[in-house]
Amino acid sequence: IPECFRIEEELKRRLRKPVMHDDQHGTAVVTLAAIINVCRLTGIELKRSKMGQVGLGAAGSAIAKLALAYGVGEVMVTDRNPAAVAPLVAAGAHSTELDTLLQRADIVVCTTGKVGLIKPEQVRRGQVIFALSNPYPEIDPDVARDAGAAYAADGAAINNALAFPGIFRGALAVRAGRIDSQMYIAAAEAIAASAGSDEVVPSPLSTTVHDAVTDAVSNCATALGLANTAEL
C-alpha cells in the first residue's frame, strides 16, 4: 500500500488546513472530468455505465473512489495486491480479473505503469480507454482507436495541472479546514463544463478553467459548512 495514503491522512489529522496529495486527487479529478465529457461525446450514460479501474496505486485508488462518490453505475477494480483491492470493495466496487474487466467495462482507466499491458485484441469496439501511465501508456491511444475504441487518451492528455491550482485556491479563499470529496466532484464538473463542445478536457493553459474550478470549490466548501467565514 503506498505510504502516501498514511502520510496524507496523518497530515489531515494534525493540521487544520487543506491537505491534498496531487498524484491521487488531482489525477482523479481530471480523470472524472474527462469521463463526464467523453460520455457526453460518445453517448454513454455515465450513471448506468460500467467503469473498470486497472491498477490501484495512489492515482488508481483515488480515481475509483471518486467514481464511486460521483455515482458511476458500476466500478470494477483489479490489482495484483489484494490489500489494495479490499478498501475499494468495501466502498462498493467489484473486484474482477483483468480479462473480465476489459470484456465488460464501457470505460477503462489504467494506472499500472506497465507498457503494453492491453493488447489490441482485448479492446472492445465502442469502448473508452484512458491509459494514463507516464511516460509510456498501457496501450497507445492510436492503437486503441484502430482496434475499435470509441475514444482513447494517455496521461499527457489527462493533465492534473487542470485541477490542483483551482482546488487549492478555492479552498484557501474561504479558509476551508479540509477538502471534501464533494469539493473534488465540484472541481471535476467545473473542468468538464470548461471544455469546448468537441473537447474532453480544456487546455491547462486556459485561465478560464482555473477560475471556474476556484469558484466551484469555494462555493461547494461554503455549502458544506467547511468555510471558515469568521476569518474572512
Label for each model-derived stretch:
Residues F5-K12, V29-I36, A64-K65, V89, ...:
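Predominant activation on well-ordered alpha-helical scaffold segments within soluble catalytic domains
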Residues H25-G113:
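Glycine-rich phosphate/diphosphate-binding loop of Rossmann-like nucleotide-binding domains
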Residues I1-S49, F168, L172:
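Glycine/serine-rich phosphate-binding loop and adjoining beta1-alpha1 elements at the start
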